[in-house]
Design a protein with these regions (language model features):
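Surface-exposed ligand/attachment interfaces on beta-rich extracellular proteins
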Residues: 52-67, 145, 149-150, 183-187
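Surface-exposed loop/edge segments in extracytoplasmic proteins
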Residues: 27-28, 41-43, 48-50, 82-83, ...
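Glycine-rich strand-loop-strand elements at beta-sheet edges
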Residues: 54-60, 74-147, 163-178, 236, ...
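Aromatic-lined ligand-binding clefts that engage carbohydrates, nucleic acids, or primary amines
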Residues: 70-72
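Disulfide-bonded cysteine-rich modules in secreted/extracellular proteins
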Residues: 4, 20, 47-55, 170-183, ...
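Acidic, glycine-rich loop-and-strand cores that form catalytic or ligand-binding grooves
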Residues: 151-153, 158-269
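Intrinsically disordered, compositionally biased repeat/linker segments
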Residues: 1-45
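A short, compositionally biased
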Residues: 1-2, 14-15, 27-30, 136-145, ...
Length: 310
C-alpha cells in the first residue's frame, strides 16, 4: 500500500486517515495523487479491510501499516480424540467409547492490535483416538492461542480433554467410562463493538451496518465460548450385547458437527472431528469384529483479516 508521511514536531508521521473540507463539510480522502514529471502518481490510498486468511498451522504474521484491529471470524481449539470400545469374555456386558470433546471457540470478534507488531498464531492439533482396550485414554486437543508482540495475550482457546475407559479386564470387571470435557475459552483482550471501517471494496460501514461481521460459524457478531463434551454411552448389560460409541462434541456452539459414533449398526470406527469438534467413540460387538477404535479430533484454526477502526 502507498504510504504518505507528514512532519510533526520534527518527526515524520505516517498518515492513516485524511480529510478535506468541501462545502463546509469534512470529507474523508480516499485517494491522493501528485504530479511528477508530467505524470500523476498515487501517494495515498485509504486503508481498506484485507482479505481473510485461514491459519491451520502455527506461525506469525505482521500487522500491516494502517491497520489497528484484527477481525477473527473463526478460531477454535483442537477437538479431543474418541475412546475405542471394549469387548469381554463372559463378563456380563460390553463397553462403548466416549466421544471426544470440542475446543473453545471465537466467532466474529474484533480486537485492537498495533500496526507493525508481530502476531503469533498457535494452532491446536486434534487429539488422537484410541484402539479398543480395557485401560485407554484418548488424547487431548491442543490449545489455539493468539498473542501480539506489543498487544500481548489476546485469547487462549483450550482444546477438548479426552475421555477414558479404565479398570476393565477380558473376563471382567467391566471398565469405568469417563466422559470427555469441552475446552475453556480465556479472552484476555476486550473485544471492540463500535466504530467504523472500510470494507475491501472501499465501502464505509459501521459495526451496526457491516454485513461481514456475522458470517462466522455461529452467525452472530461477537461470540465466544467453551467447547462441548461428546456423549458417553457407557456399558451395556448382558454377554455379547451390542452398543454404539459416543458421538463427538460439536464445535462453534453446535454449528460444526462432531465425529460420528462407531458401530453398531455397521462396523465403522468412530468418525473424525472437523474444525475443532470432538471425534466419535468406538462401539462393541460390531458385525465382523469385536469392537472398534475411536476417531481423531478436529484440528483448530484461526480465520482472520485486518481492519482500521475509526
Amino acid at each position: 500500500m502507498t504510504s504518505w508521511y507528514i512532519k510533526a514536531s520534527s518527526a515524520w508521521k505516517q498518515v492513516n486517515q485524511a480529510f478535506v473540507k468541501s462545502s463546509s463539510a469534512w470529507k474523508e480522502i480516499q485517494e491522493g495523487y501528485i504530479k511528477v514529471g508530467g505524470a500523476w502518481k498515487s501517494f495515498y490510498v485509504a486503508f481498506v479491510a484485507t482479505g481473510f486468511t485461514t491459519q491451520t498451522s502455527t506461525g506469525t504474521v505482521t500487522v500491516p501499516d494502517g491497520a489497528n484491529a484484527i477481525h477473527v471470524q473463526a478460531a477454535v481449539g483442537g477437538g479431543s480424540g474418541g475412546v475405542g470400545g471394549a469387548d469381554y469374555d463372559k463378563a456380563g456386558g460390553e463397553s462403548a467409547g466416549a466421544g471426544g470433546a470440542s475446543g473453545a471457540y471465537v466467532s466474529d470478534e474484533v480486537y485492537s492490535v498495533t500496526e507493525g507488531e508481530t502476531l503469533t498464531l498457535t494452532i491446536g492439533a486434534g487429539g488422537a483416538g484410541t484402539g479398543s482396550g480395557y485401560n485407554v485414554t484418548a488424547s487431548n486437543g491442543g490449545n489455539t492461542v493468539l498473542s501480539g508482540s506489543t498487544t500481548g495475550a489476546i485469547f487462549t482457546l483450550a482444546g477438548g480433554t479426552g475421555g477414558s475407559g479404565t479398570g476393565g479386564g477380558v473376563q471382567g470387571p467391566l471398565r469405568s467410562n469417563s466422559p470427555s470435557v469441552g475446552g475453556s475459552a480465556t479472552i484476555n483482550a476486550t473485544p471492540l463493538t463500535s466504530g467504523s471501517f472500510r470494507e475491501s471494496d472501499g465501502t464505509s460501514v459501521t459495526f451496526n451496518t457491516a454485513t461481514t461481521l456475522d458470517q462466522g460459524p455461529v452467525g452472530t457478531f461477537n461470540q465466544s465460548g467453551n467447547g462441548t463434551a461428546g456423549t458417553n454411552p457407557g456399558n451395556c448389560s448382558g454377554d455379547n450385547c451390542q452398543i454404539s460409541g459416543g458421538v463427538g462434541g460439536s464445535s462453534y456452539a453446535g454449528n460444526v458437527a462432531g465425529g460420528t459414533a462407531g458401530g453398531p449398526p455397521g462396523s465403522a470406527a468412530g468418525g473424525a472431528g472437523s474444525r475443532g469438534s470432538g471425534a466419535g467413540g468406538g462401539g462393541a460387538q460390531v458385525p465382523g469384529a469385536f469392537s472398534t477404535s475411536g476417531g481423531a479430533g478436529g484440528a483448530g484454526e484461526i480465520k482472520f483479516r485486518f481492519l482500521r477502526i475509526n
